[in-house]
Structure formats: structure tokens, C-alpha cells
Amino acid sequence: MRVLAITGYKPYELNIFSNNHPAVSYIQLAIRRRLLSLLEEGLEWIVISGQLGVELWAAEIAYDLREEYPQLQVAILTPFLNQEERWNEMNREYYEWIVSQADFVDSITKRPYESPAQFRWKNEWIVRKSDGLLIVYDEEKEGTPKYMLEVAKRKENYAIFPITFSDLQAIIEEAQINETQIDNRFDF
């Protein structure tokens, strides 16, 4: 697999209203683990649409992994021009920081927002141009990632790597066990 699309929930869909929320680090750890195994198999590009939440958190992880895997490149393909225009200042600054480090940035429709169809076109285009999809999504909690997942399921020979709430819960439990083990070393 050379090109991996990544998507998932937007922050508000997870009741996350800050990038410092503890859940973000667990989501990023899950993404990091999946990316590491795919990098060992030859992954070269990740593609995101630049939406807030999982996509930008994944880009952060990709930038961190570049130290060890300099071949990893990030493409941000927005559904329309200036998608960040109506975001608050903090989100815009975070987005601009992510975009500033990307290897490739473009708009799929090359027009400002006109209709919800631009989101559908974005999903179809990104799936068509990638070899697989890493998606933070649980079908028991519907959200916006379902639309890209539906497109991905229709493409033949297309790998889908889900990260579900069960996967995230396992990571949280593992972290808690490790934290307890560390704390116990210093009990006198």
C-alpha cells in the first residue's frame, strides 16, 4: 500500500472541544500504531481532507513519524477553497500549522463552498486516488465518517483499517495498566 486516506470523527462528534483533551492522545496512539505497521510495508503518502478532528490529529502523528520514516508524505485535499474560513481563530491557527508542513495541498473542486455535493465529490476522489482507508469510526455511533466509509466499501480491492471504540478502550486500559505498573515501582 502506497497511499492511505485517513478520516474519522470531527471533534464535536466525540464531545472533544480542545486538542489537549485526554482522548486525543489515545486516538493518536491508535493511529500511530496503524501507521507504523503500514510504513513497514511501504506506505509513502497519507491523504486527508483537512477537516478538524481525526484528520488533523493524524497529520500531527505523520509529521512526528517523518523523523524515522522520511519517505512519509502528507497530502491535504480540501473539498473546497477556504474551508477554514468560518472556524474560530484557534482552530484556524491549528489548521494553518498543519497545512504549513504538508507536502501537497490543493482543493478538489477549486471553488468556494457551493453545496454539500462537494463533500461527496471529496470522498469519491480521495477513495479513488488511494489504496486504503484508515478510519476512526464505530458503526454503533453514526457520524460524518460514514459517508467516506460507504464510498470505500464500494471500491474493489480497497483495504479498510477501522479503529473502533473497542480498539480505543483497549488502548486506554493498556495505558492505565502501564501507568499503574510504573507507579508501583516507586511504592515503598
Swiss-Prot record:
Pfam families cross-referenced by the UniProt entry: YpsA
Cited InterPro entries: YspA
PANTHER family linked to this entry: UPF0398 PROTEIN SPR0331 (PTHR38440:SF1), UPF0398 PROTEIN YPSA (PTHR38440)
Protein family per UniProt: Belongs to the UPF0398 family.
HAMAP family given in the database record: UPF0398 (MF_01575)
Protein name: UPF0398 protein GWCH70_1907
Organism placement in taxonomy: Bacteria, Bacillati, Bacillota, Bacilli, Bacillales
